[in-house]
Amino acid sequence: MRLLKVFDSKNYLDNFNSFERYACRAIIIKDNKVALVKSNLGYYKFPGGGIATGETRIDALVREVLEETGLQVKRDTIKEFGYTYEKRKSLFDDQGIFIQYSYYYICECYDEIIEQNLFDYEIEEEYSLAFMDIDDALEKNAAYQEEIDTFIIRDNFILNLIKEMIK
C-alpha cells in the first residue's frame, strides 16, 4: 500500500518510549457524497478504528464500519487507497511517543443500515452516519480544527485527496 503522507509533530524526545497503533478507515462514496461519522462535538471523521490482535486489516475495516455506522461493507469491492503515518507525543504519557498507521480503503456498502455497536465515548458523542458533500465536511471540520485534533488534520488531508479524485 502506498504512503500518502507523514504527520510528524516533532513534539517529543527521541528517547521516549513509543506505542504503535494500527487502524483501518473506509472511504465510501455514494452519489458524490462521502460516508462519514458525525460527532455532536462538531467534527466528521472517516468510519474505522483499531485493528484487534489477530485480526486482518480487511476484517477490522468491515467490523469498524459496521460498529460505527451500521453499514455492511461489500467485501468484494474493497480496494487499497493508501496509508498515513502519524508520530507525536502521547496524550496519555508525558514521556511517550504515539505512532499510528491508518490504512484507508475504498469500498461499497449494502443499502440496508443496521444498528450501531458503539463504545461509551462514541455514544456520548452521539456518533451517527452522515453522507456529506466533501466541501461541507471540510468546512465543518475547519471550524472544529481550532482544537488542532490530529485526526481531523489527517482526515481533512484524505478528504482533499478524494475531492481531487472525483472531480
Language model region names:
Residues 43-44, 114-167:
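Nudix hydrolase/Nudix homology domain
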Residues 29-68, 72:
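Conserved Nudix-box catalytic region and its N-terminal flanking loop in Nudix hydrolases
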Residues 72-83:
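A short coil-to-beta-strand element that immediately follows conserved catalytic motifs
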Residues 86-116:
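Active-site-adjacent beta-strand/loop module that shapes the phosphate/pyrophosphate-binding cleft
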Residues 51, 84, 109, 134-137:
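Hydrophobic pocket-lining residues within nucleotide cofactor-binding pockets
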Residues 28, 106-108, 131-133:
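Short, well-ordered beta-strand micro-motif
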Residues 1-25, 31:
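Acidic, metal-coordinating catalytic segment for phosphate/diphosphate chemistry
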